[in-house]
Design a protein with these regions (language model features):
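Substrate-binding/active-site clefts of carbohydrate-active enzymes
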Residues: 47, 54-59, 67-271, 291-309, ...
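Carbohydrate-interacting/catalytic domains
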Residues: 1-65, 71, 78-81, 96, ...
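Active-site-proximal helices and loops of the catalytic beta/alpha 8
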Residues: 16-20, 43-45, 176, 180-184, ...
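Short, flexible loop/turn elements at secondary-structure junctions
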Residues: 65-68, 124, 149-152, 192-194, ...
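Aromatic-rich carbohydrate-binding modules that target alpha-glucans
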Residues: 557-606, 614-634
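Structural recognition of the beta-strand scaffold that forms the well-ordered cores
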Residues: 61-65, 117-122, 141-147, 186-189, ...
Length: 650
């Protein structure tokens, strides 16, 4: 069977695209072309609605706290209430002047580092008052979801999204244009769970483009829950209905609220936002998120959405259920904590703590789409736990080469950290100070971001542990005939007698150090690994090319060694129902198979297909369901997300 598959896997039809199938620019150009020719208001673009999906796994994210990044327009810093601004930058609870012009000014710095998407803290208009001495510089105390925070745009600029819908002449619109000109994406942080705390006798005053529509203290329309603070964090009802730190908590059962929040976020998407990061998702029921994400995908099918389930973990059934059934992926807190414990804190288990997380990937439908990180704005920075730049390099290499979508917290590349009070909030949000493009971590991120875009094994492939001790960790990423071998050392210099790489025999050059390594019989012998050293060896195989590429992901199928999942159907690309010519998928983990299927002859046509399990020496096991049907897009990239329908022995 493998012999039958081999020609089909490598002799794909000629490409209509550029040679570099994996460049972010290709996907961006496709999206731009669609945006430039939208359907009329009365026309529904059914092809776009049912055949497009965003591919975000090749991105390198960079998370920015807007107020603490760069002040590109000092004239707007005082804002409506000068009391909320500290020009000395000594009061950590007040605004320090960062704005959207500052981000525009530094886009070339970010682009050069290999950043392909920036995640910004919320840009909505905030309350202009102090709560326990703190201003809403973080963006999570919203007053009006349909207006831009005036502190982030130029003085006198219209903050209303409605009033600038036609002109699109705000600093925010210029940021979108500058990003897209550089083939970069914008991730907008949004908050659906709450509005604002009690300040000066007011709480939860909410506006719809300047018109007051809700008030926690005068809530006849029941826009808010009124159950007080969460007392028991193990009680799901309390977590979803009670207050978090005194914040007015929305009542998701109120259809007026749901219509308002969805219409607001759609306006931001219409202005060019590419992806959404959703705050505090564990504090609202999953049915709300299913409705919300469904509406967002119907409005903008190529939007990518991920949520913050604080301290999610693969052993936490509720967070796993959310990741699998909410319509969005999540931030991978489980891996983050394991990396911090193993590398920053040096816990005895070391890399075994990290492998324990990867061993649970089968619990997720989309483990390769989890957002990975080593720190953020809600915890001490990695370097506040361990200031050794060499161990930071190991941690960055890990998240940039292992499964998931890596996210770098602003300033990490410049070793930015303030260790006051252990680096806890608010000291984990210092002002960005340096812009050194020769910083070692800056250069590391640039190299590894390029690797992620060039080598599909790193962004989409399976991950296989090849060597592990508490101090040394080796793994292989594999997709089709592309490979990446990674070896990390958190400890002293060590010589490894032999380690399997799966690379072809011959000399290979480390992406990071340019050191040479000889592979024989797929292994490296007597490998010397320096103290806190890293080795990254890459081999890029033949790329999948076609007029339309379908990225098919199948979950829920249990296979044994030697069994292969294939896609069969009524078109030549899928073998015309001949199981011997069906298209083979790639094993990702025990819950996920994946394939990129090129379509040329059938592009733009309706096809039928189903999945089958090829078993050596036994009859194939086909799904027990009516054939799936799909209209293949005429060109570009499509994603199928399917769940195996248990087969029936014939």
């Amino acid at each position: 069977m493998r012999k039958n598959f081999h020609p089909h896997m490598v002799n794909t039809p000629p490409s209509l695209f550029s040679e570099d199938q994996y460049k972010v620019e290709d996907a961006e150009a496709e999206v731009a072309a669609i945006i430039e020719t939208p359907p009329s208001e009365t026309e529904i673009d059914l092809e776009f609605l049912y055949t497009r999906d965003i591919e975000f796994r090749q991105e390198t994210l960079y998370f920015i706290v807007v107020d603490r990044f760069y002040d590109g327009d000092p004239a707007n810093s005082e804002g409506e209430n000068a009391e909320l601004y500290d020009p000395t930058r000594q009061d950590w609870g007040k605004y320090w002047g960062g704005d959207l012009q500052g981000i525009i000014d530094k886009l070339d710095y970010l682009k050069s580092m290999g950043v392909t998407a920036i995640w910004l803290t919320p840009l909505f208009e905030q309350i202009e008052d102090l709560f326990v001495g703190n201003a809403a510089m973080h963006g999570y105390w919203t007053k009006d979801f349909k207006r831009i925070n005036p502190r982030f745009i130029a003085n006198g600029e219209e903050p209303s999204l409605n009033k600038t819908q036609e002109t699109r002449d705000t600093t925010f619109d210029r940021l979108i244009a500058e990003l897209h000109d550089r083939k970069m994406k914008l991730v907008l942080d949004i908050v659906c769970n709450h509005s604002s705390p009690d300040v000066s006798g007011t709480k939860g005053e909410l506006y719809d483009d300047g018109v007051k529509i809700a008030d926690f203290n005068d809530d006849e329309q029941h826009w808010y829950h009124h159950y007080g603070e969460v007392q028991d964090w193990e009680n799901e009802w309390q977590v979803q209905n009670c207050e978090l730190s005194g914040l007015a908590t929305f009542n998701e059962n109120n259809i007026q609220y749901r219509n308002y929040i969805k219409s607001a976020i759609k306006q931001w998407l219409d202005r060019g936002v590419d992806a959404l990061r959703v705050d505090t998702v564990k504090h609202m029921p999953i049915w709300f998120w299913q409705e919300f994400t469904g509406d967002m995908y119907n409005h903008k099918p190529d939007v990518f959405i991920f949520g913050e389930w604080i301290f999610s973990h693969p052993y936490d059934d509720r967070s796993v259920e959310f990741a699998n059934h909410s319509g969005m992926t999540i931030l991978d807190f489980g891996l983050c904590v394991a990396i911090r414990e193993a590398l920053a804190q040096g816990l005895e288990g070391g890399f075994h703590l990290i492998q324990d997380i990867f061993d649970q990937d089968y619990r997720y439908k989309g483990a390769t789409e989890l957002i990975t990180f080593i720190d953020n704005h809600d915890m001490p920075r990695f370097q506040s736990l361990n200031s050794d730049p060499a161990i930071l390099k190991v941690a960055i290499t890990l998240i940039m080469t292992s499964r998931g979508i890596p996210c770098i917290y602003y300033g990490t590349e410049q070793y930015l950290h303030d260790d006051t009070n252990g680096g806890n909030d608010p000291y984990n949000r210092p002002m960005m100070e340096k812009w050194d493009t020769d910083s070692e971590i800056y250069r590391y991120i640039r190299l590894l971001s390029g690797l992620r875009r060039l080598n599909p094994a790193v962004s989409m492939g399976s991950q296989w542990q090849k060597y592990i001790t508490p101090d040394v960790y080796g793994y292989v990423r594999r997709y089709r005939d592309s490979l990446c071998f990674v070896l990390l050392n958190r400890g002293e210099p060590v010589t490894i007698p032999e380690v399997e790489t799966q690379l072809p025999d011959g000399e290979h050059t480390c992406v990071m150090t340019r050191n040479k390594y000889e592979v024989k019989d797929g292994k490296i012998y007597d490998l010397q690994l320096e103290e806190r050293g890293v080795i990254v060896l890459s081999r890029v195989g033949e790329r999948v090319k076609g007029q339309t590429i379908v990225r098919a992901q199948l979950n829920g199928v249990q296979t044994q060694p030697g069994e292969i999942i294939v896609v069969t159907g009524d078109c030549p690309e899928l073998g015309n129902w001949d199981i011997a010519r069906a298209y083979p998928m790639e094993y990702i983990n025990t819950n996920t198979w994946f394939a990129e299927i090129p379509f040329n002859e059938s592009a733009g046509k309706l096809i039928s297909y189903k999945y089958a399990m090829w078993r050596e020496g036994r009859s194939p096991l086909r799904e027990n369901l009516m054939n799936r049907r799909w209209v293949i897009a005429k060109e570009g990239t499509v994603k199928w997300r399917d769940t195996w329908a248990p087969g029936r022995e014939s």
